[in-house]
Amino acid sequence: MTTHNRPARVAEEFRHELSAILARGLKDPRITGFVTVTGSKMSPDLKEATVYVSIHGDERVRKDTFAGLQAAAGFLQREVSRALRLRNTPHLRFVYDESVARGDRIERLLREARTQGQAPAADVEPAPGAAPDDEAEE
């Protein structure tokens, strides 16, 4: 039996189960932002889980929610391990994933540039063989 993919499989199950637990909500009043688990990595020995989260809200909401997640790490570790029936409970470490916030910011900047006439109306190149102004002539 090959076990070289086991950490990746366990990480994906860990991410899925943690997402479900967070969707049900935690009782910590600091967790007010919308939390998305964007990814997870498991150490080869399955003793440490790094979970990447994106938190929607202003800076204060993100900081408070992240602090609440870190405080709830022990509870979340136990719940996920119980659901996955892992022999050892992996140590849970949260990392704030800024990629979603960066993507939202880029989208907003592109939208603003389009409305001010500073960017092309379409980010997509025309299909091969299509005239660039097919729609404009109709």
From Swiss-Prot:
InterPro entries the record matches: KH_dom-like_a/b, RbfA, RbfA_dom_sf, Ribosome-bd_factorA_CS
Gene3D superfamilies: 3.30.300.20
Keyword Membrane: no
Keywords, in A-Z order: Cytoplasm, Ribosome biogenesis
Region (Disordered): 112-138
Subcellular location(s) per record: Cytoplasm
Principal cellular location given in the protein's record: cytoplasm
Stored PROSITE patterns: RBFA (PS01319)
Composition-biased stretches (Low complexity): 119-131
GO biological process: maturation of SSU-rRNA
Molecular function per GO: ribosomal small subunit binding
GO cellular component: a single term: cytosol
The protein's role, per its UniProt record: One of several proteins that assist in the late maturation steps of the functional core of the 30S ribosomal subunit. Associates with free 30S ribosomal subunits (but not with 30S subunits that are part of 70S ribosomes or polysomes). Required for efficient processing of 16S rRNA. May interact with the 5'-terminal helix region of 16S rRNA.
Annotated family: Belongs to the RbfA family.
Subunit structure: Monomer. Binds 30S ribosomal subunits, but not 50S ribosomal subunits or 70S ribosomes.
Name the record gives this protein: Ribosome-binding factor A
Gene giving rise to this polypeptide: rbfA
